[in-house]
Amino acid sequence: MSTLTLAKAKEILKMHTTEDHLFTHAAAVSAAMGAMASIFGGDKDHWEAIGYLHDVDYEAFPHEHCHHVREFLEPEGVDEEDIKTIISHGWGLCSNEVEPTTDIEKSLFTVDELTGVVMAYALMRPEGISGMELKGLKKKFKDKKFAAGCNRDVIKQGFAMLGMEAGEVMQACIDGMTAHKDELGLK
């Protein structure tokens, strides 16, 4: 088995996903994971691949999310460590199989929800994500009615798991997503 690449992750996701919004979310999480890899000294392409593929079973099994990851990824030659990393993002939400313990797992757990807040804020701003300031994102994050579907408790739990300040992780998401704004359909 070889290291999962972003190109391979994109191939695999196309086999199991048809909904545009899931591809956009995959790209957002991938972009944020690339930024987190830079913080932790990880392999950027690999971290982006994990982020891109994290919801591989969601469209087929929305009510059993994370429970079918292995059956989708083992036949594609994805190694066990990567499968466990992907499953870990559902810890306490839809699966208790793998608790996030590594930097990559904790990052995925955190940015999965956080990218939703960043995306919602970017979509409401006339200038999109370009020039987005941390101060504005923090203000929106505190407003529980804004992007209400994004679980703030999970995001805060992720900050604590990572041992990082909220602003540091938020800035990584902004930076990662800004670098991929065209792919995300943002200005």
Where are these regions (language model features)?
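Conserved active-site and cofactor/substrate-binding residues in soluble primary-metabolism enzymes
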Residues: L4, T24-A28, E64, T102, ...
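Predominant activation on well-ordered alpha-helical scaffold segments within soluble catalytic domains
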Residues: K10, K14, A27-S30, G34, ...
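C-terminal binding/interaction regions
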Residues: L134-K135, F141-A179, E183-K187
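Acidic/His-rich, divalent-metal-binding segments that scaffold phosphate/diphosphate chemistry
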Residues: M1-F61
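Metal-centered catalytic cores of metalloenzymes
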Residues: M1-D20, A31, V98-E99, S107, ...
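Divalent metal-dependent catalytic cores for phosphoryl transfer on phosphate-bearing substrates
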Residues: F40-F146, K156
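Structural signal for hydrophobic packing residues in well-ordered secondary-structure cores
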Residues: H16-T17, M33, A37-F40, E76, ...
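Solvent-exposed alpha-helices and their adjacent loops that cap or buttress functional pockets
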Residues: T5, E99-P100, D153, L162
